[in-house]
């Protein structure tokens, strides 16, 4: 569990821009929440948990999310993400890459609004998200590594889909009523076949 949260922190560095329509209604000294759609653009880094050093398994990542904020606390988003995953083989030591794209549906919970109420001018709003996704892998570099005749039971040769669960934390920094910069770290828990190696436990992709 400690390692999980360390990865979340490590990949919460690249910023994400969030654009939203007007989210408040003003009336003579009162401000009311207005449900609204939003758009999120993200770029950063990812890490595929595997048998290699941490830095060797870092790869680029990008995401696009479209969502809707139903209440000050609760929202949903539909997104597409992915780019590249990496894996490592121990003997002889080798690295390989594979490409993937992922669709995801997340539930969002604004912790600032949950515990402090709706405040449209709040500078920093932490949030939690959880959901599910489907990753579609292709161009698997594991097909070309030297395994000394060891049979990779979970090797996928061309293309393959993987169901997964998602969870993560984020922080929204308000720039204006319509724009925010977001720092987010998350993990996707995928089928054991994702990195082509059998480990009898789920594969993890952090970004």
Positions of the model-derived regions?
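Residues that define the transmembrane beta-barrel architecture of outer-membrane proteins
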Residues: 35, 56-62, 99-103, 124, ...
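Gram-negative (and chloroplast) outer-membrane scaffold detector with strong preference
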Residues: 74-148
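Extracellular loop and loop/strand-boundary signature of outer-membrane beta-barrel proteins
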Residues: 26-27, 49-52, 89-96, 148-157, ...
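Predominantly the C-terminal beta-signal and adjacent terminal strand-loop region
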Residues: 89-93, 98-100, 176-207
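Short glycine/proline- and aromatic-enriched beta-strand/turn motifs that initiate or cap beta-hairpins
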Residues: 21-67, 139
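Residues on the lipid-exposed face of transmembrane beta-strands in outer-membrane beta-barrel proteins
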Residues: 41, 45, 64-68, 105-111, ...
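Short loop/turn motifs that connect adjacent beta-strands in outer-membrane beta-barrel proteins
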Residues: 22-36, 73, 113-125, 175-178
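Bacterial Sec-dependent N-terminal signal peptides
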Residues: 1-25
């Amino acid at each position: 569990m400690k390692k999980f949260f360390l990865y979340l922190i490590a990949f919460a560095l690249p910023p994400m821009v969030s654009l939203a329509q007007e989210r408040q209604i003003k009336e003579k000294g009162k401000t009311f929440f207005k449900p609204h759609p939003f758009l999120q653009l993200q770029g950063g880094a990812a890490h595929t948990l595997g048998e290699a050093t941490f830095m060797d398994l870092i790869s680029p990542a990008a995401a696009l999310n479209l969502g809707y904020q139903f209440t000050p606390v609760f929202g949903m988003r539909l997104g597409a993400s992915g780019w590249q995953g990496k894996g490592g083989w121990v003997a002889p030591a080798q690295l390989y890459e594979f490409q993937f794209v992922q669709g995801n549906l997340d539930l969002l919970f604004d912790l600032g609004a949950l515990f402090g109420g709706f405040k449209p001018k709040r500078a920093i709003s932490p949030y939690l998200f959880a959901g599910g996704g489907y990753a579609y892998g292709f161009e698997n570099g594991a097909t070309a590594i030297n395994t000394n005749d060891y049979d990779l039971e979970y090797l996928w040769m061309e293309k393959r889909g993987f169901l997964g669960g998602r969870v993560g934390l984020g922080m929204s920094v308000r720039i204006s009523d319509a724009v925010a910069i977001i720092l987010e770290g998350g993990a996707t828990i995928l089928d054991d076949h994702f990195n082509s190696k059998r480990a009898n436990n789920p594969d993890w992709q952090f970004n």
